[in-house]
């Protein structure tokens, strides 16, 4: 349950939406930056909701950007429904639908050195970050995001995103802050 220990700015309670409403903000052709670095600290709910909407007929293919590999709620769920147009800078080979899509040429993939990607996004080399989807532990009274354990390129994506979706994960201990 999201409460004032996790969302400390009362003005932001008006912005809470369901995963399905968050997924509706993501449209065809967008560049979507997600938090996370390996299967840690990455968003889960909105990407699963997006995959479900696509299964039900929504037309949407997006580019997924991250700090490293992320978990199956992004790579497997979205690749399995044909939602991923492009993927950078890395993916987990254990996500079979992603691997198959890349090998069949259905998903454009750049296997780029992880340490270079954030700076290149910052310089605008790959275009705009349309949406950043960030997993957080909490949001402070000032509106600052307390990230989860896998930061990755989240700060760069937030800096440049036109829209920001924050998934507050209440299972992450609050003492991660600091």
Language model features by range: what are they?
Residues 1-178:
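Conserved alpha/beta enzyme-core scaffold
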């Amino acid at each position: 349950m999201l409460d004032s220990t996790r969302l400390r700015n009362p003005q932001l309670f008006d912005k809470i939406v369901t995963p399905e409403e968050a997924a509706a903000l993501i449209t065809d052709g967008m560049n979507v930056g997600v938090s996370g670095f390996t299967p840690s600290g990455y968003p889960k709910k909105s990407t699963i909701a997006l995959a479900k909407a696509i299964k039900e007929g929504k037309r949407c293919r997006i580019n997924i950007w991250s700090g490293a590999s992320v978990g199956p709620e992004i790579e497997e769920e979205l690749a399995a429904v044909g939602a991923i147009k492009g993927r950078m800078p890395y993916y987990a080979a254990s996500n079979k639908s992603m691997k198959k899509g890349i090998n069949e040429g259905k998903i454009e993939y750049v296997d780029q050195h992880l340490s270079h990607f954030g700076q290149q996004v910052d310089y605008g080399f790959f275009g705009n970050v349309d949406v950043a989807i960030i997993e957080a532990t909490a949001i402070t009274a000032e509106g600052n995001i307390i990230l989860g354990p896998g930061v990755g390129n989240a700060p760069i994506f937030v800096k440049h995103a036109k829209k920001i979706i924050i998934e507050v994960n209440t299972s992450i201990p609050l003492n991660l802050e600091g």
